[in-house]
């Protein structure tokens, strides 16, 4: 057996925990105010109607309603609409 660890083994052993990014509430789901819709780095999704953006670009619901994904001016947006209008 080796008496020294070897060059590479002593430099290994680091890994970071996952950040749990991604969409948390999907289209058509009913949410309450304050619920997190998307955790993201940068603005992959932009806030729309009744949606706010946190300091780390997290999108959250400002009002209760149904989640709606859309595109406006070439940007992916997320809106919160009244649940009654979701008859589709």
Curated annotation (Swiss-Prot):
State one Pfam family annotation.
Answer: Ribosomal_L27
GO process terms (BP): translation
Has UniProt tagged this entry with the keyword ATP-binding? Answer: no
InterPro entries recorded: Ribosomal_bL27 (IPR001684), Ribosomal_bL27_CS (IPR018261)
> What GO molecular-function term can you cite, just one?
structural constituent of ribosome
Q: Give the Gene3D superfamilies listed for this entry.
A: 2.40.50.100
For this record, an example GO cellular component is:
cytosolic large ribosomal subunit
| Keywords noted in UniProt | Ribonucleoprotein, Ribosomal protein
Which region ranges are annotated with the description Disordered? 1-21
What protein family is recorded?
Answer: Belongs to the bacterial ribosomal protein bL27 family.
NCBIfam families reported in the protein's UniProt record: L27
What is the name of the protein in this document? Answer: Large ribosomal subunit protein bL27
Name its species. Mycobacterium ulcerans (strain Agy99)
UniProt gene name: rpmA
């Amino acid at each position: 057996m080796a008496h020294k660890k070897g060059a590479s083994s002593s430099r290994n052993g680091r890994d970071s925990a996952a950040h749990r990014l991604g969409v948390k509430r999907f289209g058509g789901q009913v949410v309450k105010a304050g619920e997190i819709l998307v955790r993201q780095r940068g603005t992959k999704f932009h806030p729309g109607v009744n949606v706010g953006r946190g300091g780390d670009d997290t999108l959250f619901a400002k009002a209760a309603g149904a989640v709606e994904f859309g595109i406006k001016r070439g940007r992916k947006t997320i809106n919160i609409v009244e649940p009654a209008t979701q008859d589709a």
